[in-house]
């Protein structure tokens, strides 16, 4: 869809991980299927979100757990109607959309440009490693040229475990610069 995601024309200033987690955490979700779970993040307020293809591959029942801010607290809500909009097995990406006419507008995150990242830049991930939702891990970019199975990857020292797959890797400007995976 047109206007599916936003890219900041002028990058915002860098901030602390603590500030950014408070700002961005609501846009990160847990993706559940009968055979497992992963992470994801909203691109738009209307419920379009990204996860990894391998998280939802072959699944027909996909539930998205979202954490809404309510009176200074985070409230978990499961959305049972998630439609697959697009999938790319080679890129290991899937675009989903929550189909719930009563859903509120969702917090979403901007995409950044991973080409401007440099080795040594600080990055962090938010996800659900081992099912532990809303876990934050931090590290640095180790290399931008890691090739595996015909694909180019960003490699980071940020701790990534099963369940992080599909979640965002952020720079310190609060922009998504990668989608965590390593199946």
List the model feature ranges, each with a label:
Residues 31-34, 158-162:
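Short loop/turn motifs at secondary-structure junctions and domain boundaries
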Residues 44, 84-86, 143, 171, ...:
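A residue-level detector for short acidic-glycine micro-motifs
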Residues 89, 128, 146, 167, ...:
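Short, conserved catalytic or interaction motifs in soluble domains
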Residues 41-42, 160-180:
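Catalytic nucleophile loop of clan PA
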Residues 136-147:
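Short, compositionally biased
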Residues 1-22, 27:
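N-terminal targeting leaders that route proteins to membranes or the secretory/organellar pathways
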Residues 52-57, 127, 137, 162, ...:
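Short beta->alpha transition motifs characteristic of CBS
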Residues 27, 33-37, 44-127, 131-134, ...:
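Conserved active-site neighborhood of the chymotrypsin/trypsin-like protease fold
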